[in-house]
UniProtKB/Swiss-Prot annotation:
Source species taxonomy: Eukaryota, Metazoa, Chordata, Craniata, Vertebrata
Compartments reported by the entry: Nucleus; Cytoplasm
Organism the protein comes from: Mus musculus
Protein name: Barrier-to-autointegration factor-like protein
Pfam families, per database record: SAM_BAF
Assembly: Homodimer. Heterodimerizes with BANF1.
Function of the molecule: May play a role in BANF1 regulation and influence tissue-specific roles of BANF1.
SMART domains: BAF
Length: 90
């Protein structure tokens, strides 16, 4: 975990609360806009989607790429971020 990005470290430092979706590591400004237009305005809403997919990273990555326009790198980073958050808080 020493190779954790500062953004991931910040996200994992506390409960999600009312954080905007842009707080999730791997979510660029452009992707955040796409997510907000699809109703995923808060990090907890995106986490809910991840949980609905039974924390299956590959399925979540396919979904965020196909439905929201994420790059493979964004998809990988965001799924890792949500998985790590679940490990810390659930």
């Amino acid at each position: 975990m020493d190779d954790m990005s500062p953004r991931l470290r910040a996200f994992l430092s506390e409960p999600i609360g009312e954080k905007d979706v842009a707080w999730v590591d791997g979510i660029s400004r452009e992707l955040a806009i796409n997510l907000v237009t699809k109703g995923f305005n808060k990090a907890y809403v995106l986490l809910g989607q991840f949980l609905l997919m039974h924390k299956n990273e590959a399925e979540f990555q396919r979904w965020i790429i196909c439905c929201c326009g994420a790059t493979e790198c964004e998809a990988r980073q965001s799924s890792t971020c949500l998985k790590e958050w679940c490990s810390c808080f659930l």
